[in-house]
Amino acid sequence: VLRPLVPALLLVAVSHAAASQALPESQALPEAPACRALFADGRAPTLTNPKLADRAVPLCFEAFAVLHSGVSRTPLYAAERLTRRSVSAARRVERADAFHDEDRLPEDDRASLADYLRSGYDRGHLAPAGDMPSAVAQAESFSLANIVPQNRAVNRGLWAAIEESVRRLASERGEIFVVTGPIFEGRSVGAIKGRVLVPTQMFKAIYDPRTGEAGAYLVPNAAGAEWRAVSLATLRETAGLDVFPALPEASKAKAMALPEPQEFSRGGPESFADFLKQLAVDVLRRLWSELMRAIF
């Protein structure tokens, strides 16, 4: 059930005027020290819209970091460092969906499983389960602190293809930093169950530390959505967030050539080998499970 946004929650909507400069140091949000390795040059994304800072809480997980908003009851971003090795490890982890509430957050400031029940929206990951290099990391990715209400067609189609394309890019280049987040823009922002804000758009920003290139995918959170590439400077104005604050303005002014979103490709030897390995692992696990059930 999608309900109109109550006026108080409009505080989270991005204002282009408010996004013109970073928060002063006195308003800077604390960083989780253990998560600094997940940020480009060890610096967390910076909120440039002060309205987004209200009831914002940073959380550190094994393979990603989030900044969670008690106003929207969603994450404002999830940050990751993807490498060739981590992507290869992630392909060997069997997916086990187990969405759960995030107990580290105040109950009134977080989403619950009940909020998403019969909402008409998918529980969309910011840091994808498919990026997680271990079973523990994958389980953590199903925390609702890493989830936003996402259009089903987008989540299962275009967005899934973007996630896979980013993993392939990490495999090709060796290391990239990724920041993913929602955008709440305009006066038509809605909320499921009157509690959890529904993004109007989604972004996935990428930075290659070897070449200095950066850019972002921008996708409307609606059926029939098409993606476009934007610079980090454009994203900052739209989202109220400087995703890679350590980068020079010259790198933020131009969008890198982003790979065309596509699902898992068997076109290259490396990706085909990974596919065959994962297929073999999945088949063996199913056979083992069936054998155990037959015996016991």
Go through each PLM region and give its residues.
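Domain-level detector for secreted/extracellular nuclease and nuclease-toxin modules, and
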Residues: 4, 11-296
